[in-house]
From Swiss-Prot:
Subcellular locations according to the entry: Nucleus
The keyword Ribosomal protein appears for this protein: no
Protein's name according to its UniProt entry: Ethylene-responsive transcription factor ERF019
Alphabetical UniProt keywords: Activator, DNA-binding, Ethylene signaling pathway, Nucleus, Transcription, Transcription regulation
Native organism: Arabidopsis thaliana
DNA-binding region coordinates: 13-72
Entry function: Probably acts as a transcriptional activator. Binds to the GCC-box pathogenesis-related promoter element. May be involved in the regulation of gene expression by stress factors and by components of stress signal transduction pathways.
Length: 144
């Protein structure tokens, strides 16, 4: 019997992620119009993997509605992304890792695709700025 069977977690409640048999959560997404996939990373929590998927999905697809996302309240639908798949991959991975690092609750959040600052409340009831802007990770590179 594996971990998922013993805990009753054979399937995730979040879209775009899966659990490895050793317990890590992973996420990847297809690049529209290609057969390519972007590996978004391996995460300690399902929420971290799901946020990474949301950021990448939003940046790649620019959906009219955020209802298809795992955490629709975390992204601002008015932002537009004009970034490369590699930069989207980096922003998504960093957003997921930030969630894994102990970020618990969002108080005012924008997409990881735009040039915005995001505020999260951590487990110590403090509000700290967390910038998950893709442009910060690029250092001025890979803009489309």
């Amino acid at each position: 019997m594996d971990y998922r069977e013993s805990t009753g977690e054979s399937q995730s409640k979040y879209k775009g992620i899966r659990r490895r048999k050793w317990g890590k959560w992973v996420s990847e997404i297809r690049v529209p119009g290609t057969r390519d996939r972007l590996w978004l990373g391996s995460f300690s929590t399902a929420e971290g993997a799901a946020v990474a998927h949301d950021v990448a999905f939003f940046c790649l697809h620019q959906p009219d509605s955020l209802e298809s996302l795992n955490f629709p309240h975390l992204l601002n639908p008015s932002l537009v992304s004009r970034t490369s798949p590699r930069s989207i991959q980096q922003a998504a991975s960093n957003a997921g890792m930030a969630i894994d690092a102990g970020i618990v609750h969002s108080t005012s959040v924008n997409s990881g695709c735009g040039d915005t600052t995001t505020y999260y409340e951590n487990g110590a009831d403090q509000v700290e700025p967390l910038n998950i802007s893709v442009y910060d990770y690029l250092g001025g590179h890979d803009h489309v």
